[in-house]
Regions:
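Short beta-strand/loop segment that forms part of the nucleotide-sugar
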Residues: 48-57, 71-73
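Short beta-strand-to-loop acidic/aromatic patch adjacent to the donor-nucleotide binding site
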Residues: 95-106
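Glycine-rich, basic loop-to-helix element that forms the pyrophosphate-binding segment
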Residues: 74-90
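A conserved acidic beta->alpha catalytic loop
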Residues: 53-63, 106
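N-proximal low-complexity "stem/linker" segments adjacent to membrane-targeting elements
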Residues: 1-39
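Conserved catalytic core of nucleotide-sugar-dependent glycosyltransferases
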Residues: 108-165
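Acidic donor-diphosphate engagement hotspot in glycosyltransferases and nucleotidyltransferases
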Residues: 62, 83, 109-113
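Short, acidic, metal-binding catalytic loop of nucleotide-sugar glycosyltransferases
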Residues: 39-48
Length: 165
């Protein structure tokens, strides 16, 4: 459906978002973990999404399915360089919604991207509050909470979301 207001056409996000979603996964020397991540990412993939793996100098080099683009650093440049490479390739591809995943995290349900692209916030993350085992860090506190968002005093994200804006 398209609506025109004062001569300006508007199309609902749900009609266009999937073709402009970009997913980048950073990896380094974890072939088995990356394989699991790829299985889950492709199972719950938004229609038309671009998927990229940034291999940060893995030995042996990472391998990906033919439907996935591979960016490789010949030698490890670190997580920051991998995330920057992820942003660059997704922006260059014209993606509007950018999801940067670590290789040890993945979606577990269809439609996982909808709360992110429907949020008015241009930058969000999925993160864990503390360690799963008996050892606890207890270093994060809740700053803000509403019915859609929680803001913490620190960052421990395994997936970062950015809107192109």
């Amino acid at each position: 459906m398209q609506v025109t207001i004062d001569g300006v056409p508007y199309v609902p996000v749900s009609n266009t978002a999937c073709s402009r979603i970009g997913i980048a996964i950073s990896t380094h020397n974890r072939a088995g973990v990356l394989s699991q991540a790829m299985e889950h990412q492709l199972r719950h993939l938004p229609a038309g999404a671009l998927v990229v793996v940034v291999d940060d100098g893995s030995q042996p080099p990472a391998t990906v399915p033919t439907s996935v683009n591979l960016i490789r650093h010949d030698k490890s440049m670190g997580i920051v360089a991998s995330k920057n490479a992820s942003l660059n390739v997704l922006m260059d591809a014209g993606c509007e919604h950018l999801f940067l995943w670590d290789d040890d995290a993945w979606p577990i349900a269809d439609g996982w991207w909808l709360p992110y692209i429907e949020s008015p916030e241009p930058h969000l993350s999925y993160q864990f509050l503390d360690l799963a085992g008996a050892r606890k860090l207890n270093d994060l506190a809740v700053l803000y909470r509403d019915d859609q968002h929680i803001a913490y005093t620190g960052q421990r994200g395994v997936m970062l979301y950015y809107h192109r804006s």
